[in-house]
């Protein structure tokens, strides 16, 4: 895990324009660093409203450091507020996790509308990276119905690897550990390992195809 009492967090980057170098912390995992956030980020939604270029603040800071990394993943809150808009404006693509539950489908339309608006007004380069099915339980008809609907909606952009419901995945955060450290042999850890490999392969193939054009 990482120290939850860090002096700086993502809030300071967005609101106080602190450099990412002050916020980024190392982890036990090789080549993995993290920019933590905390409860103060919720207050950023209100403070951003009155700021100039409020949707661009994260992008402006990320441009200073992006060449230091192969990939930068932004874990967005479930709401479509200004923090999420900042994330979309700063991103090359969006990877959408979809829980295999009924209400997950309800929010997909609104999410896609928001991404389309961002593409039109704030970030014309943004694209859908893909959709990842999570909390999948093969025993339920509902989960299988959600899979069917998501594949119908996103077609070939749905990742083949699904993330199953798994007790170990639920337990790991409470111990401040990633699943690969908490229980690398669990179904959840193996699923995420396969998903990561599928993601890398997909991106490498796309980069190769782009280079050949």
Q: What are the functions of these language-model segments?
A:
Residues 1-213:
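P-loop NTP-binding core
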């Amino acid at each position: 895990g990482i120290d939850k009492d860090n002096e700086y967090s993502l809030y300071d980057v967005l609101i106080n324009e602190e450099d990412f170098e002050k916020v980024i912390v190392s982890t036990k995992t090789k080549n993995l660093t993290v920019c933590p956030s905390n409860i103060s980020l919720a207050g950023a939604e209100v403070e951003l409203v009155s700021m100039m270029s409020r949707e661009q603040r994260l992008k402006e800071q990320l441009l200073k450091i992006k060449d230091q990394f192969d990939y930068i993943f932004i874990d967005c809150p479930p709401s479509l507020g200004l923090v999420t808009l900042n994330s979309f404006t700063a991103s090359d693509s969006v990877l959408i996790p979809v829980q295999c539950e009924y209400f997950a489908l309800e929010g997909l339309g609104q999410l896609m509308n928001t991404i389309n608006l961002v593409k039109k007004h704030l970030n014309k380069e943004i694209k859908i990276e893909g959709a990842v099915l999570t909390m999948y339980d093969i025993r339920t008809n509902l989960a299988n119905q959600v899979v069917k609907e998501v594949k119908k909606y996103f077609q070939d952009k749905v990742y083949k690897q699904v993330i199953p419901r798994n007790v170990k995945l639920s337990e790991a955060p409470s111990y401040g550990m990633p699943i690969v450290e908490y229980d690398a042999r669990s179904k959840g850890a193996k699923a995420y390992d396969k998903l990561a490999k599928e993601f890398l392969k997909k991106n490498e193939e796309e980069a190769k195809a782009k280079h050949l054009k």
